Amino acid sequence: MKYPKQIRTYCPFCKRHTIHKVERVKKRPRSELSAGQRRFRRILKGYGGFPRPKPEGREKPVKKLDLRFRCTVCGKAHTRGRGFRVKKFELVEV
């Protein structure tokens, strides 16, 4: 899917329609020092199996896109609705 690099859309911070730059956000690596991750590592230690049951069903073939729209006037970024599933994604100059 081809998507424009810049679009004119509503900015909730400026409260008006402005030009926005479109950014695709990648998943960052997990923080190994967060409280939840430290607790999880502690549970995994020693004998015994995994602390949670296996998830039901199957893995989805494609992840949802995480698009951020950054306002060129105020510089703040926001999302617009939920992400959508697409195999190929490309930002193009219009």
UniProtKB/Swiss-Prot annotation:
One of its Pfam families is Ribosomal_L44
The record places its C4-type zinc fingers at 11-74
Q: Which GO molecular function terms does the record list?
A: large ribosomal subunit rRNA binding; structural constituent of ribosome; zinc ion binding
Instruction: Cite the binding residues for Zn(2+).
Output: C11, C14, C71, C74
Mind naming one GO cellular-component term on file for this protein?
Answer: ribosome
Record field: transmembrane: none
Biological-process GO terms, alphabetical: translation
**Coiled-coil regions listed in the entry:** none
Cofactor field: Zn(2+)
Q: What note does UniProt attach to the cofactor annotation?
A: Binds 1 zinc ion per subunit.
> Would the keyword Transmembrane be found if you checked this record's keyword annotation?
no
| Database matches in InterPro entries | Ribosomal_eL44, Ribosomal_LSU_eL42, Ribosomal_zn-bd
Give the keywords, sorted: Metal-binding, Ribonucleoprotein, Ribosomal protein, RNA-binding, rRNA-binding, Zinc, Zinc-finger
Function, as annotated = Binds to the 23S rRNA.
HAMAP family referenced in this protein's UniProt entry, alphabetically: Ribosomal_L44e
What is the annotated quaternary arrangement, including any partners?
A: Part of the 50S ribosomal subunit.
UniProt family annotation: Belongs to the eukaryotic ribosomal protein eL42 family.
The name this protein carries in UniProt is Large ribosomal subunit protein eL42
